[in-house]
Amino acid sequence: MARAVVHVMLRAEILDPQGQAIAGALGRLGHTGISDVRQGKRFELEIDDTVDDSELAMIAESLLANTVIEDWTITRESQ
């Protein structure tokens, strides 16, 4: 078994109000040096060797990400 990790993030040109709220809270809590925060999602899929990159891409585009406003990346982790 292996693990595929799909990271989904808002596109750079899309406003991220959650990220802005986190950045503001960090400043109020006394944390300095952080100029921006972007919030995203991480999906971990336990897969066997028959699942190839094109199938993972299809899953990411059709189910996990809203491709109008989000970008995604896939990495594989061995266990």
UniProtKB/Swiss-Prot annotation:
EC nos: 6.3.5.3
Tagged with keyword Lipid metabolism: no
Catalyses which reaction(s): N(2)-formyl-N(1)-(5-phospho-beta-D-ribosyl)glycinamide + L-glutamine + ATP + H2O = 2-formamido-N(1)-(5-O-phospho-beta-D-ribosyl)acetamidine + L-glutamate + ADP + phosphate + H(+)
InterPro entries: PurS, PurS-like_sf
Gene Ontology biological process terms from the UniProt entry: 'de novo' IMP biosynthetic process
Pathway the protein acts in: Purine metabolism; IMP biosynthesis via de novo pathway; 5-amino-1-(5-phospho-D-ribosyl)imidazole from N(2)-formyl-N(1)-(5-phospho-D-ribosyl)glycinamide: step 1/2
Any one GO molecular-function label of the UniProt entry: phosphoribosylformylglycinamidine synthase activity
Gene3D superfamilies listed in its UniProt record: Phosphoribosylformylglycinamidine synthase subunit PurS
Organism superkingdom: Bacteria
Localization terms from the record: Cytoplasm
Chief place where the protein resides: cytoplasm
PANTHER family cross-referenced by the UniProt entry: PHOSPHORIBOSYLFORMYLGLYCINAMIDINE SYNTHASE SUBUNIT PURS
UniProt family annotation: Belongs to the PurS family.
Subunit structure: Homodimer. Part of the FGAM synthase complex composed of 1 PurL, 1 PurQ and 2 PurS subunits.
Free-text function comment from the UniProt entry: Part of the phosphoribosylformylglycinamidine synthase complex involved in the purines biosynthetic pathway. Catalyzes the ATP-dependent conversion of formylglycinamide ribonucleotide (FGAR) and glutamine to yield formylglycinamidine ribonucleotide (FGAM) and glutamate. The FGAM synthase complex is composed of three subunits. PurQ produces an ammonia molecule by converting glutamine to glutamate. PurL transfers the ammonia molecule to FGAR to form FGAM in an ATP-dependent manner.
Entry protein name: Phosphoribosylformylglycinamidine synthase subunit PurS
